[in-house]
């Protein structure tokens, strides 16, 4: 799939695209955003509610198989944490005030697989397992799902396999839950994937296929192999409605947490949410769920590395999955391994095009610096890609286009939710190395 040469030639002359080519950090406000209710909102709301109910049915099973979820009775959820100290550090670093409250959605602390992918990835595997068991007549929705631990179920599921292409975190979530249920799982991993993620999957009995190419190639190869096996279910990060629904459930969970903090998004108290974006499924699902709940009172921005701005490029050009960052000469090489995606999901891009407020890009060095600052100020440890959201309010208030967007709203009482997408499963020595890089970069910056 490649862009027509004439279209690409015209695009390369665009001044904004030139900034992307030069790997400059940019802020882009989406001119295609529409006000008002979402199309087919009732249908989507029903599907998301059904996904939530399915998670509830599986909760007793999850609580028993994964003891770390027992306290939450098998519900896979993360805390919402105010980051006033981090906000203060950034105000000092950028020498300007950032109005409003800053909250960190701590998906890096999600149980089982330690990232936002625990939402969509685990959900799709659970749905597949439930469908198989229901069709076989082994299970009814009214059953206590703890019976899924029995050998008759794990033996039954072992006849089936699951495949997925991943830069790391999606593979972890699907591999861990799939193996626990008894499925044979194969994760097709791109060159960007961290070694510790591959090692952990192999420890769980998952087959890891490694590729020297990027994420899109790993997905394509996984899809191709799965098509040859009628007993293999391929979880397609680029096109999956079920992954999307699993992520969308996060919106109602966040609403419950905001309600507990007496935060009611409105014209007077607008909600700004910043989500790191790879292929688009995770942030797309969360964004869609939030827009269903809060409508025009929530403003969602996607964050991408300067070397991998695939969703921004797809949205800005209107070409979606028909264009890749490599088409404009970018290398898709970034320390933000979870975001190292060259081609966006067209399914997600087209769905979120009318509701997304915008996108921005962030340099690797900034991610490391933010990682260190957050560790020091709040004792929260995220992996580099998960810090992309933290740069959102900075870009909103520091760039001309960001300020132009913010001026339309009452920012004094705005609430900024930064989505921390992964980190708790990173080995201690790797996290310490990230922290050292960030500390060194910050020191050099302060010496200038």
Curated annotation (Swiss-Prot):
Protein family per UniProt: Belongs to the serine/threonine dehydratase family. DsdA subfamily.
GO biological process assignments: D-serine catabolic process
Annotated protein name in UniProt: Probable D-serine dehydratase
GO molecular function terms listed in the Swiss-Prot or TrEMBL record: D-serine ammonia-lyase activity; hydro-lyase activity; pyridoxal phosphate binding
EC identifiers of the protein: 4.3.1.18
Keywords per UniProt: Lyase, Pyridoxal phosphate
A Pfam family annotated for this UniProt entry: PALP
Class of enzymatic activity (EC top level): lyase
Gene source species: Bacillus subtilis (strain 168)
InterPro entries recorded: D_Ser_am_lyase, Ser/Thr_Dehydratase, Ser/Thr_deHydtase_PyrdxlP-BS, TrpB-like_PALP, TrpB-like_PALP_sf
PANTHER family: D-SERINE DEHYDRATASE (PTHR48078:SF9), THREONINE DEHYDRATASE, MITOCHONDRIAL-RELATED (PTHR48078)
Domain of life the protein comes from: Bacteria
N6-(pyridoxal phosphate)lysine PTM sites in chain numbering: 117
Reaction catalysis annotation: D-serine = pyruvate + NH4(+)
Keyword Lyase part of the UniProt annotation: yes
Cofactor: pyridoxal 5'-phosphate
Keyword Glycoprotein applies: no
């Amino acid at each position: 799939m490649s862009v027509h040469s004439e279209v690409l030639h015209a695009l390369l002359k665009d001044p904004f695209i030139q900034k992307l080519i030069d790997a400059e950090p940019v802020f882009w406000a989406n001119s295609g955003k529409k006000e008002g209710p979402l199309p087919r909102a009732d249908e989507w709301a029903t599907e998301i509610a059904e996904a939530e109910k399915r998670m509830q049915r599986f909760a007793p099973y999850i609580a028993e198989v994964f003891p770390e979820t027992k306290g939450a009775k098998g519900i896979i959820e993360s805390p919402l944490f105010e980051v006033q100290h981090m906000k203060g550090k950034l105000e000092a670093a950028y020498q300007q005030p950032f109005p409003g409250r800053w909250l960190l959605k701590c998906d890096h602390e999600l149980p089982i697989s330690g990232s936002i992918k625990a939402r969509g990835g685990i959900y799709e595997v659970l749905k597949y397992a439930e469908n198989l068991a229901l069709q076989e007549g082994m299970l009814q929705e009214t059953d206590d799902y703890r019976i899924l631990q029995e050998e008759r179920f794990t033996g039954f599921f072992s006849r089936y396999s699951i495949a997925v292409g991943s830069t790391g975190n999606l593979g972890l979530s699907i591999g861990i839950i799939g193996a626990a249920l008894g499925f044979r799982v194969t994760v097709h991993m791109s060159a960007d994937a961290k070694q510790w993620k591959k090692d952990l999957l192999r420890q769980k009995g998952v087959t890891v296929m490694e590729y020297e190419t990027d994420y899109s190639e790993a997905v394509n190869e996984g899809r191709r192999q799965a098509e040859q096996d009628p007993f293999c279910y391929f979880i397609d990060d680029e096109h999956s409605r079920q992954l999307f629904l699993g992520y969308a459930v996060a919106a109602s969970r966040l609403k419950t947490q905001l309600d507990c903090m007496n935060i009611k998004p409105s014209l007077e108290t607008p909600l700004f949410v910043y989500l790191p974006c790879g292929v688009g499924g995770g942030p797309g699902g969360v964004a869609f769920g939030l827009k269903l709940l809060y409508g025009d009172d929530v403003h969602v921005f996607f964050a991408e590395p300067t070397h991998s701005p695939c969703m921004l490029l797809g949205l800005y050009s209107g070409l979606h999955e028909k264009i890749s960052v490599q088409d404009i000469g970018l290398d898709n090489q970034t320390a933000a391994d979870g975001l190292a995606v060259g081609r966006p999901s067209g399914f997600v891009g087209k769905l979120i095009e009318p509701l997304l407020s915008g996108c921005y890009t962030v340099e690797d060095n900034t991610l490391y610096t933010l990682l260190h600052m957050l560790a020091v100020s709040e004792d929260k440890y995220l992996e580099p890609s998960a810090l992309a959201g933290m740069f959102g309010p900075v870009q909103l208030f520091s760039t001309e286009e960001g300020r132009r967007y913010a001026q339309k709203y009452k920012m004094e009482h705005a609430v900024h939710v930064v989505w921390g997408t992964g980190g708790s499963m990173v080995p201690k020595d790797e996290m310490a190395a990230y922290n050292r890089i960030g500390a060194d970069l910050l020191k050099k910056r302060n010496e200038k």
